[in-house]
């Protein structure tokens, strides 16, 4: 007698533990699910609404400075350590885990103009208005010992910025000229000067480490190679660039923060015009810093706000502000890509989430799966008008809101004026300048 027996694999329907979810057989044939897209749209809409409900980006404020915060530096080896320099010459080392100051140093007379940490994290360098470069140990002195710098270099002019090489015992300073220093020498290895104006900021390329760039008060951005005796290239803009930052993942890309309220992303190989123009600020942009992924950057502005921009987007995806926060002078993105730190005029350092609605701490597997699913749904439907409107909605201070309206009116007036000038001129005599290239005056090699 022949008997046919049903044979099932228990792995397909039996849970491994009693805490697992029950396995439900599903048929994913689209013909059986005609309302799949409307259901997904509703879920995407609800996920977008909940994202705005839970958007609480502010985490903490670090107070302790007695004057405005002028510069911030990250520790290359420790996520929880941050250094800040103030306008009264005071440098503080902060423990972000405990949210308290672990050490205070009276480093300079006058402003602390620049601050950078050595690549190994054992010491840091400061420059100030007293024409000195000082190297300090990261370790606290023993009981009863005085806080003294490891090394002091006295310069001939005021230093306005400093940055350290990513791998070697070399650092660069700027002021009346750009100087490349060896840590063991009291005189610069190499000096660069192009024109008579002073240099306000200098940055090493983190990938092509022999390349560095500077911003001058003559509205210029200059590229240098520390192996060559002369600068490489100079680009002159309509207005002054306050600072710049190199992309940590793309060796040739950097973003410059300009006085004309915009940020410009350049490719150092093609300096005739920027790759992208980022606009949303309503006052001068004072600082910029990239995320470790190189896909986004954060900017600080004189309009009392900070904004987060995707690299490929011309407009910001996020804006942060508080009632008490004044002009934001410096900003940094943490090395774990989770937080943003900013220092402002009213003597506070604020810690923000990089993603405003992100839940901090450990996530259960189900939470992580739901989060990833909602994120994919939002990306799928982000062009739909209702979802786009909710995702873009932000509350702004009245001052910023009114300035945005005013700038829109001014921009429209300039556009109409150009159209009328072109209409009443000989065809082809009035060119149409692109937004990317109209701010570049000259490129000098």
UniProtKB/Swiss-Prot annotation:
InterPro entries: Sof1, WD40/YVTN_repeat-like_dom_sf, WD40_repeat_CS, WD40_repeat_dom_sf, WD40_rpt, WD_repeat_DCAF13/WDSOF1. The keyword rRNA processing applies. Keywords: Nucleus, Repeat, Ribonucleoprotein, Ribosome biogenesis, rRNA processing, Ubl conjugation pathway, WD repeat. CDD domains: WD40. One of its GO terms (cellular component) is Cul4-RING E3 ubiquitin ligase complex. Pfam families: Sof1 (PF04158), WD40 (PF00400). Residues 413-426, 436-445 have a biased composition (Basic residues). The keyword Isomerase does not apply. Signal peptide: none annotated. Gene3D superfamilies: YVTN repeat-like/Quinoprotein amine dehydrogenase. PANTHER family: DDB1- AND CUL4-ASSOCIATED FACTOR 13 (PTHR22851:SF0), U3 SMALL NUCLEOLAR RNA U3 SNORNA ASSOCIATED PROTEIN (PTHR22851). This is DDB1- and CUL4-associated factor 13.
